């Protein structure tokens, strides 16, 4: 039946077609039925019955081609058959989330005023990572309802997507919403403005930071205000507004400093002819030397400024009290320290008290040390500060284990995007999703990125743009490659595993495993290139499941894989001769398979319980390996173990030479 008589179709009619599909499945003739429908569509492209049956069978087999369902929904949608469209969408969604079905269902609900519209839209934006407008509509809805958490979630999603689409006006609108909702998360705004500048051009992101600046100025957080203004000036050092504002912020921050106006004057920060960053640097160096401030000298250590008199400082060092120094000399010879700097704490607190605090509260210690060094520090530097001055080498071992766990799991820390080994302290706790996303970008090792992806799947929300970006990274390895190496195979296995769990993700798999394997020059090399133990076994199992001559490939792989599972699989599938032959070949070509021979020796010894079967030192092996082959065969098939109580190297006859 064709589209001329759409009135003949109802939900019941499609249920009849479902019964036909179910019967075909019971008789194992789904492929035959689909073939008949596809052949019919070649002549009648709008046949409703053929489109439905072919589309549903494709869906049930998880085939990528959804053209039949697209055509079917378009036909009924264009003819305003919303009840049929709803039924078809519901049927499609029985097989899993579908952008096509959810979008069509949303249109139906919008037309009919169905209150389930927002639920459908929420499902849609969680799987369609390009949909931005509906995402913003959902965010607006949650904001109006007073649900700050959900509003923030969806405004963030909308912002990511508008940035990707380079929609400047929409970015500005959503940015303003987020500044009102989460102004304290300044790291988020720094990160996103960088993306905006990369996508839309230098300076676009820094202009948006003015909105964030207004909030911190109203709350008199002068340090954050100054940092934002510095960032704006980095993009345009001639920005007159930012220059005037930073001078005003310096006056507010240091309003009690006796030399404030003098230092502003000598820095020439208000003079347009002076480079703004040189002026800022001069001012901050001078202003940091005030009564009560801590300083560090490379020879005398930590000291405290006792008095400032014009251009002269009076400083108390631990072993050099009341030392005088000119301000000009102090600027070049001394480093100013905050009161919470680890060096200051070491100098003013009793060693045993500070050591006890560090042992009891590793998270506090990490925050102190990391912020002491420009909020960018690795564990190597942490160890330098703690061992042996506060912790012994033995104490460090257990303490560092706790520290690594805290750095990995605590939302108060984040990896440096430029170097995965360095960490920063967050002023506002980062979500686990954002923390893992930053680690993923900072991590340069391919297989370490797989570990992060796995952690994200286990512990975080996979319905996020951050997870999609991770998934797309592995997808890119399958879109274009010149050589099939360990990374390509690992990417295929990861994409396959993830898309099996999350079928709505658009997996790029133009080639099946067998096709990829056919292009591998050296399977043993590829196996060694895969650094993840689980993926190694997925690779080996995939060879058996998808490669027609898998038994021959197992023979090739065995000397590298070295697992009884390889030999057992050959034996159980009727390839006993190949299993025994591969063992014998290892001995015949001992020079090329030394590791395999040693492994076989140890495996047989453990399997048969012989303790006297020791491998002689500096021994070679002859080709007479019949006894070994027999032993391996016995251990594989579970036969009666040979008596090996008195088995020694001499028992092997000419095996040892």
UniProtKB/Swiss-Prot annotation:
- Residues annotated as domain GRAD2: 1-152
Which part of the chain is the GRAD1 domain? 153-657
By its UniProt entry, which Gene3D superfamilies does this protein fall under?
Answer: Tetratricopeptide repeat domain
Superkingdom to which the source organism belongs: Bacteria
- Its name, as the record gives it, is Putative GreA-associated domains protein
